[in-house]
Swiss-Prot record:
This is NAD-dependent histone deacetylase HST3. It is found in: Cytoplasm; Nucleus. Signal peptide: none annotated. Zn(2+) binds at residues 195, 198, 220, 223. It comes from the Eukaryota. GO terms for biological process: DNA-templated transcription; mRNA transcription; rDNA heterochromatin formation; replication-born double-strand break repair via sister chromatid exchange; short-chain fatty acid metabolic process; subtelomeric heterochromatin formation. Transmembrane segments: none annotated. Residues 35-363 form the Deacetylase sirtuin-type domain. Its cofactor is Zn(2+). NAD(+) binds at residues 60-79, 151-154, 282-284, 312-314, 333. Residues 1-21, 365-393, 411-447 are annotated as: Disordered.
Amino acid sequence: MTSVSPSPPASRSGSMCSDLPSSLQTEKLAHIIGLDADDEVLRRVTKQLSRSRRIACLTGAGISCNAGIPDFRSSDGLYDLVKKDCSQYWSIKSGREMFDISLFRDDFKISIFAKFMERLYSNVQLAKPTKTHKFIAHLKDRNKLLRCYTQNIDGLEESIGLTLSNRKLPLTSFSSHWKNLDVVQLHGDLKTLSCTKCFQTFPWSRYWSRCLRRGELPLCPDCEALINKRLNEGKRTLGSNVGILRPNIVLYGENHPSCEIITQGLNLDIIKGNPDFLIIMGTSLKVDGVKQLVKKLSKKIHDRGGLIILVNKTPIGESSWHGIIDYQIHSDCDNWVTFLESQIPDFFKTQDQIKKLRQLKREASDLRKQMKAQKDSIGTPPTTPLRTAQGIDIQGNNELNTKIKSLNTVKRKILSPENSSEEDEEENLDTRKRAKIRPTFGDNQAS
């Protein structure tokens, strides 16, 4: 693997471009500070992203901060908010204690947990998807998104048309069901409640929201119905305990209820998905399971010549990620997406726009061939590409010239002049090749 020496925590300069190897993969985690359009390394990383075909994403709470949802570990994150809220009742070492499965041993902690989760749920209900969420949806629209693995529990992706793994997947025909998933929720879904006994999930209701707001976890209606049915039939109640409803999220110290399914799906993505780029956004990668996910994807992507990048404002520990993550871009995720829009605008065209542009180019090519055939048939010399582009009418071909003018007008609306798409580069290359084999004239050279 060709290596690039990691830069110190300072911005790279364009003068490095002459020393850059052909491969952008690194043996040690390298840092890119800020979003400088003149940064040669950043420019090349961006270009490789635009050319990738199967992109995997891993997201954390950092991509939802601009939607008004706090992250976990920052100075104003969820852990600190919980710690401040609880300080008037008792002293806790970390807000993380309120997200540990052991809290269900203490009725008082359950009450605080219920109140806090209802506040977070209400906050999520008002939140709107960020630019980063929409970027992930755009990857799907371009048929470039392999899968998005998210640690977030807000489910904002669903509101922009992405399919979430918030329901249990059938074990039969697993691969076809997994293929239709856009987002895999690694830590559960705040928008549903689950029973602690029968594990049935339910959408929130106003009544249950009021219960949690009072610090109470409601009883499971399915468990109650089963017990009442057995009592009416004169049968034993099988332990009699009724489950309680809690937010359907994964707490520290408990396993994901769909852990085996997610592992099976990840292996399917690695073996058959052929990922060639991994974008990690808005996470400091502290959770062990997430670390393993990144390492597995990294090996496959590096074997295929791809890159792994992390976009996050907070630095991560370097030594544990050498040879796994190539670059950390120190930036807000939404700002990075805005930077991409300015650097690779064609990448952000919709699939429909691209199809229309290709169709117009094919039609224009067919019309040029028709014009050439008609001119050859009447013994006139072929018109140079420059004159055709200028729309110079030749007697008997007015109708064809009018069609070409119309096509060029529509094309300009779809593809703005300032954008330099790969398709334009190919077309310009073809034009230059044709020019090499044609005699040049003084007035054409002056043009």
